[in-house]
Regions:
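Long, hydrophobic N-terminal alpha-helical segment
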Residues: 12-47, 51
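Terminal low-complexity, poorly structured segments
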Residues: 1, 30-33, 111, 139
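Generic structural concept
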Residues: 24, 28, 53, 60-64, ...
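Short, contiguous alpha-helical
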Residues: 43-87, 125-165
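Solvent-exposed, charged/polar functional surfaces in cytosolic regulatory/catalytic domains
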Residues: 33-37, 110-118, 152
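Bulky hydrophobic/aromatic packing residues
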Residues: 16, 29-31, 65, 89, ...
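Short, helix-capping/interhelical loops that line the mouth of catalytic, cofactor-
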Residues: 1-22, 68-130, 165
Length: 165
């Protein structure tokens, strides 16, 4: 069987837009699932945790801050801009509140919508920023961490084990 290999397909802009839409959808589902867990848990369990053994509140704050931050990093890199701060947020349990979690979820959803609507059809895929664990990644590398991050933390929480992510 012979194949035609195309290095620059004509439908790349549509493929990119669909990828953004799909990742945003998975992230939205992750946020919904996370908020459901937060709503169902007691205040004691929500505020439990330590710097080395995170409780649900810390996980929620971490996921939502990362979701928003990565969406903005992806958009900046795609535009050829500096990514800004790329470190890992580690929330203290004493700083967790239900209202704060709801606010962070709204901010993450707003950033995801902005990513979906403002991502350029021909992004800069050469500019990179250092991920705290994976090293230098372009906008697509960063984008694809979002669903994995939700999945890792939420699966670990449901299974009663810590997530190395």
């Amino acid at each position: 069987m012979s194949l035609l290999v195309v290095d620059n397909p004509s439908d790349r802009p549509e493929w990119i837009a669909e990828t953004i839409r799909l990742v945003a959808g998975v992230a939205a589902e992750g946020r919904r699932s996370l908020l459901h867990l937060v709503e169902e848990t007691t205040d004691v369990d929500l505020l439990a945790g330590s710097p080395d053994d995170w409780g649900l509140g810390q996980i929620a704050v971490h996921l939502l801050v990362v979701d928003r931050g990565v969406s903005l990093i992806v958009l900046r890199l795609a535009r050829g801009e500096d990514a800004g701060n790329t470190g890992q947020p580690r929330p203290a349990p004493s700083r967790v509140t239900r209202e704060g979690i709801r606010t962070l979820a709204e901010k993450a959803a707003t950033a995801a919508e902005r990513l979906r609507t403002d991502f350029p059809p021909e992004p800069d895929d050469h500019r990179t920023a250092a991920h705290p664990f994976y090293g230098p990644m372009n906008c697509f590398g960063w984008l694809l961490t979002i669903p994995n991050h939700y999945n890792a933390h939420l699966s670990a929480y449901r299974e009663g084990r810590p997530s190395p992510l």
